[in-house]
Structures are given as C-alpha cells and as structure tokens.
C-alpha cells in the first residue's frame, strides 16, 4: 500500500487523487507531439469504448494509471481487484486489437473519428483468457450479460498495454469536464457527494441526491456532484446526446448552488460490485469524498431469462468493504416513494402511516411519452419530458 496517500486533503482542501497524484498525460510540446506521430509504427482507429478509456487516462480520471494496463496488472486486477502495486482497482483498463504484428517497443497512433488523440507506447501484448476475465469480473460467462457479450463479440483477440501520450481530447457532442476542472469548482474542506447515473434524472433521483446531503455521515454545507456517464451503455438505453440535453435542461431549471454538474465519458460495463469500486475510484479523482450507492448499482438482467446477475445489495456491500482503504464513504440510497399525503418519503414511513403510494412504472412512462399523454410532475420534470419527446 505504499502508493496510498496518507493525508486527508490536498493543497486545495480537497481529497487527494487516488494514489496521491492526478495524472495528466496530455503532451503540450508541439515538437514532441509531431515526433511521436511521425515515429508511430501503426495507426489504429478507436472504438467509442476505447476512446472513452483513452480520454479518462489522459485527464487523470483513472489515476494513478499512466496508460493501459500490461499483462501483469491485468491479471492482478481480474484476480485480486488490485493492480500489481497493491492499489484497489475494479476492472482492467486495456486496449484491444486483432493486429497480430504489433509487439512491445512499437508505438501506435490512436485516432477517433480520424482525430489524432494519442500515441500508445506498447509494453505488453497478450491473448487474454476471456472466459476467466468474464467469470472473475462479471461473475458469469453468459453472453446474456452485456459486458460479457462485449468482451467476446466486440473486443479484439489481443490486449495491448503501455504508456499513453495524449494530444487532444476526443471531440464530443457534449463537453466533459476534466478532474482538474471539476475540482476547481468544489468548495474546500467540505464533503462532496457523488451521484452516478446513466439515465435521465426524474423526481425520485432528485429527491435521492438532495436527501443524501442530509445523511448522518455527510457534513453541513456539503455539495453533491451529479456526474452522469455519457459513454456507451446498454443497447436499450437512451443515447448519450439525448441524456446530456436532459441534464442541461434540468441544471438550468433547478439552479441550486449545492448541486454541481459534470459529465463523464465513461463506458458502462454493468459489472455490479466491481463497477461500484471503479466508480468510487474515478469520483475520488474528481474530488468526491462520498458516493451514493443504490440498490443493484450497475446491475443488469439476463436478456434471456430476465433474472438479475447480482443481488440488490452486492454492490453496496462490496463498496462498504473498500471504503476505508479508498478514503471514501458510501451513502446508501433511501427507498423513496411518492405519497399523496406527504410527497416523497421513505417506503418504511409510508407503510407505517398507511399513506397512499403513487406509482408509475417505466413501461407506463415510456407509453405515455410515445403517445403524448400527460406525465405527472411528481414523477418527472417537465423540462426532461420535453427533451425526451422532442428527440
């Protein structure tokens, strides 16, 4: 654990980045950039998932990593949840390819939609045991799990590890603040609670993350960082651009100084407990001290049977085990319901006082959305509904 930062805050009064230093892999020297490009042995076009990982490496969101994991670190992470230096890590960060010729010592120019974003200096190339990776990281080999399907059907035959030299961030339809930029907006010496989501935010979500600021383990005058992922998710999820527009509309509508907004170019794996750990590491690098953990966080169902791959509290329990070492606290999400008498309260309180609970299922919501039917404002913000309908 030698790399684990000992102090509570960095020089700006914020929690230190994971491993003690926020990595910035972007090369500013134009001559060095041109030299790296001219000497590159290969040029590979990144998938959208690859591009997300390259960007998060470049800006330090995956600190303390300075590039894609080599075979030693990959094996350590999938087997032990730790890299070879002993630091906790949830999922391996690797670059995949079907190129048989690439070897250690060579360099690869990485492009995304023809934009030259980075050079990868190859230190390791191997053919992974994908069945083992799937079983250890996702708890299953079933292709009904979206990430397992991705590993076998989308990723290349080989994994490549090595140092990344960044040039420029991928041009996106929506701006994603870097950890350094987010940290500059956070208050010193106050708790910062992270809220992760991958879908449009509705009333229950809002009540959830604002109530989190009142939790016993969260200090007064704290803020919440609403930090949605806008990279690839599941096939049936709403596209990232549309999600981004709903968040921007809601940010303007709420206009609450306790709530900070930023967007994360992260590719979801739906890995349950492992992904909860990954999200906590990333959010610590963005300056967060607390992380809201909901029921079945980053979970998914079998596309064949409809059964959950993880238990409802697997992610919560695993995150709690890791929290002390990560220097981050978890904030369990309350089971909130909307009642006719009291508005949003806990399900336990509603049951105790026999209040009338109002319900609207996701299926019913989507049907009303398609048919132009009124959607109750206790369920969804009008601004969010308008964006979803217009898209």
Predicted segments, located by residue:
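Active-site cores that bind ATP or allylic diphosphates and position pyrophosphate for catalysis
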Residues: 2-391
């Amino acid at each position: 654990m030698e790399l684990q930062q000992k102090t509570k805050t960095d020089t700006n009064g914020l929690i230190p980045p994971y491993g003690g230093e926020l990595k910035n892999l972007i090369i500013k020297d134009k001559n060095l950039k041109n030299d790296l490009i001219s000497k590159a042995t290969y040029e590979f076009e990144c998938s959208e998932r690859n591009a997300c990982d390259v960007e998060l490496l470049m800006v330090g969101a995956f600190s303390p990593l300075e590039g894609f994991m080599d075979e030693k670190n990959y094996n350590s992470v999938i087997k032990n949840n730790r890299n070879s230096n002993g630091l906790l890590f949830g999922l391996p960060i690797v670059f995949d390819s079907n190129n048989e010729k690439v070897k250690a010592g060579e360099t690869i120019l990485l492009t995304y939609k023809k934009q030259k974003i980075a050079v990868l200096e190859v230190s390791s190339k191997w053919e992974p045991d994908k069945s083992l990776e799937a079983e250890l990281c996702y708890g299953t080999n079933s292709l009904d799990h979206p990430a397992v399907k991705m590993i076998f059907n989308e990723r290349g035959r080989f994994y490549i590890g090595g140092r990344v030299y960044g040039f420029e961030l991928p041009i996106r339809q929506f701006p994603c603040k870097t950890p350094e930029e987010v940290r500059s907006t956070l208050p010193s010496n106050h708790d910062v609670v992270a809220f992760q989501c991958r879908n449009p935010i509705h009333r229950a979500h809002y009540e959830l993350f604002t109530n989190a600021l009142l939790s016993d383990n969260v200090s007064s005058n704290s803020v919440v960082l609403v930090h949605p992922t806008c990279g690839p998710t599941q096939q049936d999820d709403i596209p990232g651009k549309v999600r981004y527009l709903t968040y921007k509309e809601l940010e303007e509508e709420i206009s609450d100084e306790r709530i900070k907004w930023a967007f994360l170019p992260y590719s979801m794996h739906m890995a349950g407990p492992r992904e909860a750990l990954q999200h906590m590491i990333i959010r610590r690098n963005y300056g967060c001290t607390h992380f809201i953990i909901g029921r079945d966080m980053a979970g998914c169902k079998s596309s064949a049977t409809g059964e959950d791959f993880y238990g409802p509290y697997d992610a919560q329990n695993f995150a709690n085990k890791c929290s002390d070492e990560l220097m981050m606290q978890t904030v369990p999400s309350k089971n909130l319901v909307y009642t006719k008498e009291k508005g949003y309260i806990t399900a336990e309180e509603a049951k105790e006082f026999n209040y009338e609970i109002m319900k609207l299922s996701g299926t019913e919501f989507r049907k009303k959305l398609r048919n132009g039917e009124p959607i109750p404002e206790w369920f969804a913000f009008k601004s969010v509904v308008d964006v979803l309908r217009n898209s």
